[in-house]
């Protein structure tokens, strides 16, 4: 699909311009970005990627109704189409979909259509899930080598997740679905088509072999998900938030939802800064975490300081068996002076190109010490209302997550 934009100035200097929009090119880029940005949290027994010819049963209504985005103005996008997971799996053709189970879902969806809500941005956070009892799960397992369970949530402006079923927590039907499928199948893959992180305690309860956050990947999100599931794309996304064991572990929970004011009791210790400083034991998946289908070896070749400029050179080698990309993250531990500091804070990160097995790339990571100055609002350092870089040792750590 191509569109042409033309323009002409009617007065003064007349100049005609012509620009062609290559929608196919943009769609391919969107698909690649959505696939690479998926975050693989768990992959026991090398369950992913799926192998050619594997028989797979797909559960969860969101396999048909893919969340391309959230609600509100950010979701009011006139996409020409939205790909979903089930049709993309069949289009791809690498695995064999359990079409009998697919038909059960399609018949159920006729009587349980998607709830769009009543008004702008009023779409509910989750959709009613089809009940999956033990008998259906066992029957599907007898016809398949693996199961995919797709769980969906929307998101949107003027709203946040709450500690309620269908929002941050799973619903009773989703719990039943996971319990029965994980019990019946030797290999279960859980795909999270969500706009925010959700409660993850079910991972320990039901022990699925693989867990993949695909977020909300736009109109090409379904195909992007399948690219990751089948290994066409190696996931290289990293968590941009900490996933705690329990929602009560987040310091913001205590003061969440006040319509009048937000009181940040955590002060400067927001997000991973709080957990790494005060509550490491409350973390289930750390900030910056994300697995790959291959393995990488990272080595710091050099580190230099010139004035306020800090430069590190990292050598990344793909020591695994498939191609992939890795992100090197540089963290700073600042001295604990008169102004409070988090134990670690992200300084800079860089991502490799796609490396084949055995290939190496050097990454240059640059940052400025001035960026880590703290604001002294009370004058405790003798420099009131100034940004102060306190004296002491500034220690940098390189890794692939905050740990």
Predicted regions and their residues:
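C-terminal non-catalytic regions of proteins with extracellular/luminal or membrane-system context
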Residues: 1-403
